[in-house]
């Protein structure tokens, strides 16, 4: 039987992907162990830097990450590195609000081309960032390169919302990091909780250039989706969930190859989780680094 082709890592032309979600933490060193307990393979610690306008080393951005990479999308965990920078201050401000998910990144083929559209939509995006991150490879270290276009925090209170263009996807999605004990294949969705669902969805639509769509509470993308719920509706998607602040990114969803195997792994490792009636597994709180992580069988709805 012919193998089903894997989805392309990055979008083409006018496509928009849900690229990755980011959890903010105050301290990165313990993260790899926490991800490993959940069954994720993690990338090594990597500091972020902004490419200089002239020759020289990248300027530290004040943050670093550890990631779990999937065949579609990834989960990023970010923490401070000690420098006093605008990005580090934003991370600290978000952590004071609540721990957990604070970043949604959408990937596009050409971030700079979206600047004029975002200006016209009233977002006044900050200057384009030429982000650099050193990554290990089997042949030594290399520099992963990204263009990142962020909108000002005041315009998107849900978190750090950005458009990213990958210039070196093969360095980011290295095959040795794509297999996970918990069977995760793809990042499939983000769940946003807001008082005014329609207004929040409309803003995300303007950021991504996807204003239309038949589903009023869902922003459908070429890969992945963002769903929106009110506080009163949150328990339908996340039973036992609490609301730390509004609006907020409530959960990340992951498709797994065999949900029963994921369930066995979590039980064997003593990871507290909710086994829902519709077959999803939800890990929240400290075990999920302050976030809510939803595992669902590949091909099923992440939020039910």
Which positions does each model-derived feature cover?
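A short beta-strand-loop structural module common to alpha/beta enzyme folds
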Residues: 43-50
């Amino acid at each position: 039987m012919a193998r089903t082709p894997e989805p392309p890592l990055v979008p083409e032309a006018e496509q928009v992907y849900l690229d990755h979600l980011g959890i903010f933490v105050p301290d990165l060193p313990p993260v790899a162990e926490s991800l490993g307990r959940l069954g994720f393979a993690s990338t090594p610690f990597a500091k972020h830097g902004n490419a200089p306008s002239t020759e020289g080393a990248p300027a530290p951005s004040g943050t670093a990450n550890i990631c779990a990479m999937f065949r579609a999308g990834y989960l990023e965990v970010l923490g401070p590195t000690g420098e006093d920078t605008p990005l580090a201050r934003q991370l600290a401000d978000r952590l004071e609000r609540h721990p957990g998910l604070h970043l949604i990144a959408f990937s596009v083929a050409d971030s700079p081309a979206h600047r004029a559209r975002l200006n016209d939509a009233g977002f006044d995006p900050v200057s384009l960032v030429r982000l650099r991150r050193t990554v290990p490879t089997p042949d030594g270290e290399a520099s992963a390169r990204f263009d990142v276009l962020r909108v000002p925090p005041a315009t998107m209170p849900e978190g750090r919302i950005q458009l990213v263009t990958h210039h070196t996807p093969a360095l980011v999605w290295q095959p040795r990091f794509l297999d996970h004990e918990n069977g995760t294949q793809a990042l499939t969705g983000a769940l946003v909780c807001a008082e005014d669902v329609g207004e929040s969805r409309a803003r995300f639509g303007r950021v991504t250039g996807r204003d239309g769509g038949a589903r009023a509470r869902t922003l459908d993308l070429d890969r992945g989706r963002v769903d929106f719920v009110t506080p009163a509706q949150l328990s339908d998607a996340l039973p036992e969930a609490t609301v730390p602040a509004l609006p907020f990114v409530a959960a990340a969803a992951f498709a797994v190859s065999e949900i029963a195997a994921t369930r066995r792994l979590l039980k064997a490792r003593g990871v507290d989780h909710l086994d829902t009636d519709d077959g999803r597994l939800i890990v929240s709180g400290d075990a999920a680094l302050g976030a809510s992580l939803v595992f669902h069988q590949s091909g099923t709805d992440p939020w039910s």
